[in-house]
Amino acid sequence: PSSEIKELVSSIEFKDDAKKVFFASNPQIENKDSFASKCINRAEKTAVLGCYKDSEIHVLDVKDPQLNGIKEVTAAHEFLHAIWARMDDNTRKDLGKKLTEEYERIKTPKFEELMKNYKETEPEEIENELHSLIGTQEVEISADLEKHYAKFFNNRKKIANFYKQYNSKFTKLENEIENLNNQLPNLKKEIDDKTAQYNSQLEQLDKDILNFNQRANNGSFNSQQQFDRERHQLALRKNKIDSYNKEINESIDRFNVMRQRLLDISIQNEKLYDSITTNLKTSNKI
């Protein structure tokens, strides 16, 4: 095995017998072109990070340091497919029941969406996929399943925590993108509404100032007190409108900052997905 494979094995912490199965599966860490030629053979809806094909394990060589641990999780996931392939039907049936029960207990909308994709593309492999997904992505699982996975890994939770760490990078960016996409249209509408109101108030103020000046020039005021009073009222309105304009400009500045942030993190998100994607840039799947 290559030095990189040996490092991967050391990091995953296989049990001795499991290590033999892993090496027997001829594990390979491959660049995008090589990986795609072996693992991408249909229209995928998710990013494929690894595959177990023709009794061999293939892992995409993801180099982004933000995603440290992703190769370990992928290799462990595909290794569990190799284990599943070696099980007899009775063992699979018994384990499949436990896996399905565990899935029903721990499923999230995102997990359900992932399994829906598997049901569309590989309906006969649902329990096989649950075996790999639960074993490598869920930190807390049933005692029965933990005992099962303990046959292969010295520290299964370490692998699940690798997944949790790198997946949080995607989740954090996606949540912020979603929040900004929700906030920006509302803020824009608020700015547009306030701007329309400001323009209307300013137009009326300009008319009233023009009228005031005409009356002053024509000597239409009955007293200095009336002149001063109306002039003071116009000044108060102008100050209020100026404050309103300042508030609008502050909202515009906030909008521009948020829009730039959305652009920046969208680029970050795109780069992250590009590092794990050989076909489509969507949610990650292993």
Language model region names:
Residues 2-54, 92-203, 213, 234, ...:
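Metalloprotease/metallohydrolase-associated module, dominated by Zn2+-dependent proteases
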Residues 194-228:
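Extended alpha-helical coiled-coil "stalk/arm" regions
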Residues 55-58, 80:
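Glycine-rich, often proline-containing surface loops adjacent to acidic residues and nearby aromatics
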Residues 237-286:
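C-terminal amphipathic alpha-helix
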Residues 97, 225-232:
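Short, charged, amphipathic alpha-helical segments
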Residues 85-87, 95:
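Short, solvent-exposed loop/turn and secondary-structure capping segments
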Residues 73-85:
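Active-site recognition of the HExxH zinc-binding catalytic motif
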Residues 58-74:
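Short pre-active-site segment immediately N-terminal to the catalytic Zn-binding motif
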